[in-house]
Amino acid sequence: MTMAALDVFNVPYSVPLLGSTVVILIGFIAIKALRVGSRPKGLPPGPPTEFIWGNTKQIDLFYPQYQYRKWAQQYGPVYTVMLGDTAHVVVSGLRDVRDIFIKQGASSQNRPPSRFQLLMRDGFFPGLNNGEKWRQSRRMWQAVLNNSAAKQYLPYQELETRQLLFDLLRAPTEWRDHIERYSNSVAMTMVNGRRIIDAADPRVKETIQDLYDLAETGVRGAFLDSWPFLWKLPEWMFPVCRQARKIAAKHREYIWRNYSDVAKRTSQGEVLPSVNHAIQEKLKQGWPGVSEIEGAEIGHHLLTGTTDTTASTLINWVAAMCLHPEAQKKAQEEIDRVVGPNRLPTDADAANLPYVQQVIQEAQRWITAVPLSLPRAANAPVHWGKYTIPEETGLIMNSHALHNDPDIFPEPDKFKPERWEGKPNASSNGDAQLLFTFGAGRRVCPGQHLAERSLFLVISHWLWGFDTLQATDDDKNKIPIDKDDLRPGFIVCLNPFPAKITPRTAQHRELIERIWKEELEVSLDESQQWKATPEGIARLLERVGK
């Protein structure tokens, strides 16, 4: 060391220099600390923040959509909230959603860092990943779920709808379980090549609980992503991380069990074409950058999304029919004119049943199954008015506020299917989009076409065959249904409520029984599994596996 260097430590220079350095360092740390929870400069304004907490304590984190809607009324269609020390821009205006998520979709397609939620999925969950991992998953989903491909699954959906009608005859009070079996069976047959023949099958609840665990525990552990510096501390300090790892192990066992069952049946020559079988074939041929457990997760992603979104929307629709019998009656009158009592509705009837379609659209608006879509993040600067939203800033599509905006939907609390007259394509991803159940832009739900067909088939058949009434107690008083009594999560639906489901006539009952008996004899084997995969599905999945 040179004498000049040593001079730094000599008195009288060393003490003032060291003191100044410490003061500057403490000041820098203090300034940084005082800014924790405060809104960064240059972002759209929003509600006042609190030191450290930001806006976190002002929000019910299990039901944030309600507070976000109130703030939209106060601060405008685009505002910024601070969840801890992370900024999120909440977008609630129709024009603004179209601008930020559709027109600027190339810059608003990422997911924000979700390290805690990814902890519950061993680091890989396609819907929360970015970059090449997400693109690989998306390409697979698009191949099996694009508009043309989704049409091929119609035989699966028709058969499951017919069982649903029969199940409603057999056990009408268990209507919620029948809905969940329907949606899970369509998904299971697609993904694993095996039907769910009974609502008591534990895989139905297991599938729904798997996604609920991710959502519910994700809220409890969200503070770790809200204050990212906490990840620098040992994981053992946070009990919620232990819970997350337990959920990850449970999830891994579940998806691997389904995936391995397909491989086992393939080796025994019993497999039917399925998404997981196509994934396994693709992996055998070499799928760069995708491991086998990741392949299993890509397939499972379709299973959970298809099951829960469809089931939740149908459950919410049942409540709408209980509370709005006039809409139900009008839809049934239309079905009676077009279909009549001597046959079931078909997918081809959709164009001739505009009011039924409007009922379906209104049900999705009235209670939005995915009220905040899934959070996004800017992957490039996003421009809104005079503001530039920088890369990595969180973006929240406030579908709940959009669907309850009185300027777009007058009297939004009322169930009015007529508001959708002349708007059959309101959910189509684009500049004219009005309905955002499935999101918008580059991250729109890939299963939208399949889900919309399921909603039409189930609702048109249900209206054709059954009356749905509000249940009554022993004193004949109607049992209330609160449309805000929701199960929390990414995907919301009403908590359990009773409904009275009865066949419309003996003629409707007889036709339901006869058609299901024919399905058992013609389409299904003695274990009520498909005797053979419909040709269109087999060809599609064979192509995907190459």
From Swiss-Prot:
Keywords: Glycoprotein, Heme, Iron, Membrane, Metal-binding, Monooxygenase, Oxidoreductase, Transmembrane, Transmembrane helix. It is an enzyme of class 1 (oxidoreductase). It is found in: Membrane. The chain crosses the membrane at residues 11-31. Disruption phenotype: Fully eliminates the production of asperlin. Pathway: Polyketide biosynthesis. One of its GO terms (molecular function) is iron ion binding. Glycans are attached at N146, N258, N425. It is a single-pass membrane protein. Cytochrome P450 monooxygenase; part of the gene cluster that mediates the biosynthesis of asperlin, a polyketide showing anti-inflammatory, antitumor and antibiotic activities. The first step of the asperlin biosynthesis is the production of the intermediate 2,4,6-octatrienoic acid by the highly redusing polyketide synthase alnA with cleavage of the PKS product by the esterase alnB. 2,4,6-octatrienoic acid is further converted to asperlin via several steps involving the remaining enzymes from the cluster. PANTHER family: CYTOCHROME P450 MONOOXYGENASE ALNH-RELATED, P450, PUTATIVE (EUROFUNG)-RELATED-RELATED. Belongs to the cytochrome P450 family. This is Cytochrome P450 monooxygenase alnH. It comes from Emericella nidulans (strain FGSC A4 / ATCC 38163 / CBS 112.46 / NRRL 194 / M139) (Aspergillus nidulans). The lineage of its organism: Eukaryota, Fungi, Dikarya, Ascomycota, Pezizomycotina.
